[in-house]
Regions:
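Histidine- and aromatic-rich segments of cupredoxin/plastocyanin-like copper-binding domains
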Residues: 92-99, 103-106, 161-162, 170, ...
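Fungal secretory targeting signals
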Residues: 1-23
Length: 625
């Protein structure tokens, strides 16, 4: 070895040692229990508390730290934690989605999440079992980085969360939403919109100071606009991806999306300025008269000065023009990936099945959880792990080969927007349906427009990257990534109501490499045993013949041809009308018999048939005929 080579090797080793010494283990102990909260001042309700407190703690770590979260489930229902945006490279067992990478953690049990934080930026954590994070189990996760390109450009930092809020527990809302009486799938309307889990709050700032603001939409449904009156800011990060700084004044933040911005305050302290969040009313089927869509909090320069309300109305909000995230350039200037080795094209549809409920579909498949967590199927399947069949039809599995360039084309056959998130990756955003109005988010109100591989916009040379994108109504979106992270990764709509309807599919990435590199900890098996869930076999829990899917969990059957949601509504109300009509006839008949019986009382004693309720009903039936 030459002297120069030896010096380089020693320098690299020293740098690695220095970084290793700086890294630390950060431990959080989470005891989940129900607590009472009233963040909007309108209604008390139960929420998921941690260590008896709500709002929940913001997790803060440095890049390179080991994060350990010891969760004790003191609730009366199952729970998990997903650390949204974490790649979990080599630690797929720590990703958190129930029945994909682990079993749900039953009441009374403990579960430890333990992984190295190899990323930086703005993230969040939330429950990833059926209907739990709208009950308050969600909060920001901030990863500090002393080597961020903008590290020396600010003096202080703050975290801002925005979310929708329901006064009713999801266990009560869910049966109304997934119901024969809601065939069109109208989502529950929130009761309020929160800012840092409260309302009418202030962020105290100093004059002539630059702040790094971490913005996170931790809601379950509604996207929100964000701006600060008479201020601009510089975008420097989206979803954990550093960007070349770009000035903006308004952001559109869907659920699960994040931004970091640099805000430099004014020199004077004579007034305070509204921080405005505006719920996207286009997502709501109706707007209750008491629902406050536009909410004002304050950038507070002077606590003694007035705190003015924002100069915004519902009508004016329709004219807001947010910054287009597709135009951002990652600071690493990663070029467009080469042509894909695999293209996956799917279409979003919202339809009804034979039970009359409204479901969500990707290519006519509504995601249905398997009987065995998918990661465990991979690990127990041997050579058959590369066969998509063993994972079941209704998990909508896509087996990806290691290091393939994958392109997902998502067409939207629905009139609503859908924020889609891919676990385990960020991706290049390379194309989106063209707008049909003055701004990039105005789309055709007519027939859906599908992606045409032979006639599309020019792909950007350096595409923006993030892990959650907004699929436009009746349009399309195209993303591209490298399958370099072996694991089971969920790809799903992050509107929690839509996920409950089945709007998701699964990427089974490099199953052979998973078997070689991953190890399932014993706590996983213990958790499954407590829940009575098998830990081996195919999607139907068949360990003898992995290609036999008999008994797999499946979506309900299809409606007969020609049935529509409107037809279901008509049928339901026709049946109800018929039942009510029969009831009125019965009541009328009984009242008529009673009238005749009363008329005969003066002249003769009551007969046995008149005193016998069964005979009265028989008489009424005879009268009805």
């Amino acid at each position: 070895m030459t002297t120069v080579a030896r010096r380089i090797l020693l320098a690299v080793a020293a740098l690695w040692a220095a970084q290793s010494c700086q890294a630390k283990t950060v431990t959080y102990n989470f005891n989940l229990t129900w607590v009472t909260a009233n963040p909007d001042g309108l209604a008390d309700r139960k929420v998921v508390g941690i260590n008896g407190q709500w709002p929940l703690p913001v997790i803060e770590v440095d890049k390179g730290d080991q994060l350990v979260v010891n969760m004790h489930n003191g609730l009366d229902r199952s729970a998990t934690i997903h650390f949204h945006g974490m790649f979990q490279n080599g630690t797929n067992t720590m990703d958190g989605p129930s029945m994909l990478t682990q079993c749900p953690v039953s009441p009374g049990l403990d579960f430890t999440y333990n992984f190295t934080v190899a990323q930086s930026g703005t993230y969040w954590y939330h429950c990833h079992t059926d209907f739990c994070y709208p009950d308050g189990y969600r909060q920001a996760l901030i990863i500090h980085d002393s080597e961020a390109p903008f590290h020396n450009d600010y003096e202080e930092e703050m975290t801002i969360t925005m979310s929708d809020w329901y006064h009713t527990m999801t266990e009560d809302l869910a049966p109304q939403f997934l119901s024969l009486y809601n065939p069109t799938g109208k989502e529950p309307i929130p009761d309020a919109f929160l800012f840092n889990d409260t309302m009418n709050s202030s962020l105290a700032v100093k004059p002539n100071t630059t702040y790094l603001l971490h913005l996170v939409n931790i809601g379950a449904f509604v996207s929100q606009y964000f701006y600060i009156e008479d201020h601009t800011f510089r975008i420097v990060e989206i979803d954990g991806v550093y960007t070349d700084p770009v000035e903006a004044d308004t952001l559109y933040v869907s659920v699960a999306q994040r931004y970091s911005v640099l805000l430099t305050t004014k020199n004077t302290t004579d007034k305070n300025y509204p921080i405005v969040t505006v719920a996207d009313s286009a997502l709501l089927d109706k707007i209750p008269p008491n629902l406050q869509l536009n909410n004002t909090n304050w950038l507070e320069y002077n606590a003694a000065a007035d705190h003015p309300q924002a100069n915004i109305t519902v009508a004016l909000a329709k004219d807001l023009i947010p910054f287009d995230d597709m135009t951002l350039v990652p600071s690493d200037h990663m070029p467009l990936l080469p042509d894909p080795d695999l293209e996956i094209e799917v279409t979003v549809q919202m339809m009804n099945l034979i039970n009359g409920y409204g479901y969500a579909f990707l290519n006519n498949i509504s995601y249905t959880a398997p009987k065995v967590p998918i990661l465990y199927t991979v690990m127990s399947a041997g050579d058959l792990a590369t066969s998509s069949e063993i994972y079941g039809e209704f998990t909508h599995p896509m087996v990806l080969e290691h290091n393939q360039v994958v392109q997902i084309v998502l067409n939207n056959g629905d009139t609503g927007t859908h924020p889609f998130h891919l676990h385990g990756h960020n991706f290049q955003m390379i194309d989106r349906a063209p707008s049909y109005g003055a701004t990039f988010y105005d789309y055709l109100n007519g027939d859906p427009v599908a992606y045409d591989s032979g006639n599309h916009s020019a792909f950007p040379a350096i595409p923006a990257r993030r892990d959650t994108f907004v699929l436009p109504p009746q349009g399309y979106f195209v993303i591209r990534f490298v399958a370099d992270n072996p694991g089971v990764w969920f790809f799903h709509c992050h509107v929690d109501w839509h996920l409950s309807q089945g709007l998701g599919m699964v990427m089974i990435e490099a199953p052979t490499q998973m078997q070689e590199r991953l190890h399932i900890p014993q706590q996983h098996y213990d958790t499954c045993q407590a829940a009575g869930i098998p830990v081996a076999g195919n999607a139907a829990a068949n360990t003898q013949n992995l290609l036999d899917l008999s008994g797999q969990n499946a979506q309900p059957g299809w409606l007969p041809d020609g049935f529509t949601a409107r037809g279901i509504v008509a049928l339901v109300f026709s049946c109800l009308s018929a039942i009510l009509g029969l009831g009125f006839i019965v009541v009328y008949g009984l009242s008529d018999l009673k009238f005749h019986a009363a008329s005969n009382t003066a002249g003769a004693p009551a007969t046995a048939s008149a005193a016998n309720p069964e005979e009265q009903l028989e008489g009424a039936a005879g009268y009805r005929d």
